[in-house]
C-alpha cells in the first residue's frame, strides 16, 4: 500500500495514489486527517484491511492537486553517515566498522517532492545524497536486530543535503552542515513495508542518486556496512523512536549540486522516485 499527501483547496489530504486518489480519512470513516496522525494512531492496519475489502464510492482528491511533504513534524529525523564504503572513500574517510555514525536533523529542513532545494550562497560546495528512509510505525526502544524491522511501517525515498565544503573544514561541524533549510526531502509516497518486501528481500533493494536524469551512483541495501535492522536496533538502545520518525540509512554516493540542477532518489528499478530542482 502507498500513501501520498496532496494539497487541495488550502488543505492537505492523504490519498491512495491508485488513479482515483481516494481520500484516506473517508475510507477510515474519520480519524486523523494527516499521515503523521495516522501513524501515531496506529491506523495503518485498519486502513489496509479496508482497502483490501474494496474502496467503492468515496471522496477523492483533485488529480491536479500538487504533491506535498508526506508530513512536516516528525519528532525525529536521524541520519546515518558513511554507511557505504564507496561514499566514505569519496570523502577520504573510512566507513565506521564498530558502530554507525549518526546525526539529527530538524524538521525545518523538510521540503516535499518537486519543491526547490536552496543552495545558500556562502557555504561552498553542497551535495545531495539519495537514501532509503525507514518510517517508524510504533514506539521502539531497546529492541533487538531480529525484531527491529517489525517496528517499521514503511519506507520513503530521501534526498539528504550536506554543506560538504564546511564539513571538510572540520568533521565536528556535522550538525551545522546538515541543517540548512530544504536540506531534507522525502516522498512522494510512504510505501508500506509489506509492499516493499513483496518485490524481494530488502537487501536487494537498489538505492540510486540521480543527477539531471542520469544515475550518479547506485548500490543495494546489501552494500551497507550496517543493515537497516542493525541501524534501528543500535540507535534504539540510545534513544526511543516514535511513529513518524524517519531513519535515513546512508547514501551510496553524493553528487555536487548547483542552481539549475535536478536531483533525485530512486528506490528499486521504478519502485519509487523522488526529484527536486536546485535553486
Task: Report each predicted region and the residues it spans.
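N-terminal non-catalytic cap/leader segment that marks the start of a structured domain
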Residues: 1-96, 214-215, 264-266
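Catalytic-pocket segment enriched in acidic/His residues
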Residues: 5-10, 45, 59-66, 87, ...
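Short Gly/aromatic-enriched secondary-structure transition segments
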Residues: 23-27, 93-94, 144-156
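A generic local secondary-structure boundary/capping motif
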Residues: 67-69, 90-92, 117-126, 140-147, ...
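Residue-level recognition of short, solvent-exposed, well-ordered loop/turn junctions
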Residues: 72, 112, 127-129, 242, ...
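Structural motif
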Residues: 75-78, 100-102, 108-109, 116, ...
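Structural signature of FAD isoalloxazine-binding scaffolds in flavoprotein oxidoreductases
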Residues: 94-113, 128, 265-269
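Non-heme Fe(II) oxygenase catalytic core, chiefly the N-lobe of the double-stranded beta-helix
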Residues: 108, 113-150, 157-161
